[in-house]
Amino acid sequence: MGAYLSLSRIMPYRTLEAACARINPMTAPQDAAAPIRDKLASYIDPYLGQTLAQANAVESVSVHRNGALVELKFGFPCADYGAELLPVLRTFLEPELGGVHLDLTLRSDITSHAVQRTLKPLAHVKNIVAVASGKGGVGKSTTAANLALAWAAQGARVGLLDADIYGPSQPQMMGLAGIKPQTTDGKHITPLRAHGVEVMSIGFLIDAEQPMVWRGPMVTQALTQLLGDTSWGQLDYLVVDMPPGTGDIQLTLAQRVPVSGAIIVTTPQDIALLDARKGLKMFEKVEVRVLGVVENMSIHICSECGHAEHIFGSGGGARMAEQYGVKLLGELPLDIRIREEADGGSPTVAADPGSARALAYRQMARRAAARLATLNKDYSSVFPKITVEAT
């Protein structure tokens, strides 16, 4: 009889199992991913402020011949987040990886979030986000445009409604000035599209030189009709560029438009902060969650010498956010190129996506979307409507 060599007589079973894995490393032992998965669950994402376990973000962890593969799911647009997150996770998981290569794949799962209790979400629009300011001149419209562009660039389906009826600027900023939207059925308006975003504005429907002398009720009626009669299609986010101020028009719009969250734009100076606080309180009054505060024109850096100067003061947005228990979503620079790009019809995120100022907008947008992702979801479309009839 031929000789038969039994490896089990030479080495213990566990050692044998490991040896076989090395000999034929097509797959690793089934539990090899467990230490990585357990450690990964405890990672606190800086945008969510939650562990990946709390966010239910870990879809799968597997270990193969070529290394480890981690698949994550986020409730916010994350098309360009992997490049930022991968080196951080490699360092965080270094002991568990044991020197093997780490691959990371991300996907977005953007859901609808709750709106005011007295309102129903807009059909086919998952989330409406209002961008507001207590006063004009703080860069609200520029921030709204770049917010919409940043979400679209990160993979979301985005619309932009210019509700600043007395000074509609989005047609110019989005490069759509002079273009009129069309209708296919005589009832609904097809929005214009620019830079990957669906855009609608009262500015498309009136002459650019025509002053708006409407009273409050006419304004709110026109805007709610514009919102409802536009064929937005399927959107993850609809950004509403609100009129500046905290008067009757703004309050009525906040009561009639089903908003998932609001963003307050201010500059660091005390006068702007006084009005921004009024805007924040207005949204609280109508039960709209404030996602956070954006401090615009935070710092100016001289293009000639590089000198940094806080022209409008410093830290005002952070102090306001801390005072009211909301997030500081970002500190945006005062840069002449931001103004030039907006005036030219191509806001910063589209005009110069690799610049530091565009990065500031993208990070602000991700913080806002991540904050929204942590809030209560809307389940009205999941559960059937129950009607109780008296007998």
Language-model region placement:
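Phosphate-binding/switch loop-helix module in NTP-utilizing enzymes
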Residues: I206-L253
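Extreme N-terminal, non-catalytic leader segments
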Residues: Q54-A57, H64, F74-G75, Y81-A130, ...
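Conserved catalytic-core segment of NTP-binding enzymes
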Residues: P87, W232, D236-Y237, P243-G344
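Short edge beta-strands and adjacent turn/loop segments
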Residues: G49-V70, L332
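Walker A/P-loop phosphate-binding motif and the immediately C-terminal alpha-helix
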Residues: I128-I165, D185, L280
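Phosphate-binding loop that captures ATP/GTP phosphates
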Residues: W151-W214, T220-Q221, L227
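N-proximal, solvent-exposed amphipathic alpha-helical segments enriched in charged/polar residues
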Residues: M26-E59
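C-terminal boundary of histidine-terminating zinc-finger modules
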Residues: G345-G354
